């Protein structure tokens, strides 16, 4: 039996969503419950000028961060392709097999439905929008799990989880970039 526990692990300037799978041993096995956790996750903060990408351990430690330009030409047609190429390139460079990647979290400038769909046009991304970002990016990443959230919301969650708002009962965050969010 599989139990899935979703932990939101978003950071300011970097975001990641991790899922921990717990697998119960078959009857008669004395090992009890084992926790299986993959080693790596990627986070993307998609902005109108650049996309900031981070490679993390599933415990939340930042291993490496880098940026790629956001190509807003042709209504942002190549944004997801460029992000996938950056992640796949890093996996190849670091010899990280897909089986060790828990998934990818991406913060986008605009509202998001169901952790997957950007429902309106994002002006900061050249008119990009009205697409299932999670499904499209997952397809470009050979099936890696992708979850999507509003960039300001996930940045605030990151600050609550591991940043300046850790331990606070309430917090407010305003983000500045190509646009303003909060």
State where each predicted segment sits.
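Short, positively charged and aromatic/hydrophobic N-terminal segments
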Residues: 16-20, 25, 33
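Short glycine-rich, Thr/Ser-proximal phosphate-binding strand/loop in the N-terminal lobe
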Residues: 40-81, 85, 118-120
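Short glycine-aspartate micro-motif
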Residues: 41-45, 101-105, 171-175
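Glycine-rich phosphate-binding loop and adjoining helix at the ATP-binding site
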Residues: 76-85, 99-104, 110-170
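Glycine-rich phosphate-binding loop of actin/hexokinase-like ATP-binding domains
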Residues: 166-182
């Amino acid at each position: 039996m599989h139990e899935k526990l979703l932990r939101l692990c978003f950071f300011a300037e970097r975001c990641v969503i991790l899922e921990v799978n717990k697998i119960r041993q078959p009857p008669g096995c004395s090992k009890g419950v084992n926790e299986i956790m993959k080693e790596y996750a990627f986070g993307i903060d998609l902005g109108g000028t650049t996309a900031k990408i981070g490679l993390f351990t599933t415990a939340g430690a930042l291993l490496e961060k880098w940026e790629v330009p956001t190509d807003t030409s042709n209504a942002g047609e190549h944004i997801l392709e460029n992000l996938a190429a950056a992640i796949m390139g890093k996996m190849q460079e670091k010899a990280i097999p897909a089986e060790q990647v828990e998934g990818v979290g991406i913060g986008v400038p605009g509202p998001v439905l169901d952790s997957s769909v950007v429902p309106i046009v994002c002006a900061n991304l050249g008119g990009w929008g009205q697409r299932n970002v999670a499904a499209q990016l997952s397809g470009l990443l050979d099936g890696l799990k992708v979850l999507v959230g509003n960039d300001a919301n996930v940045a605030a969650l990151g600050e609550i989880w591991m940043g300046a708002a850790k331990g606070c009962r309430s917090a407010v965050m305003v983000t500045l970039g190509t646009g303003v969010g909060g």
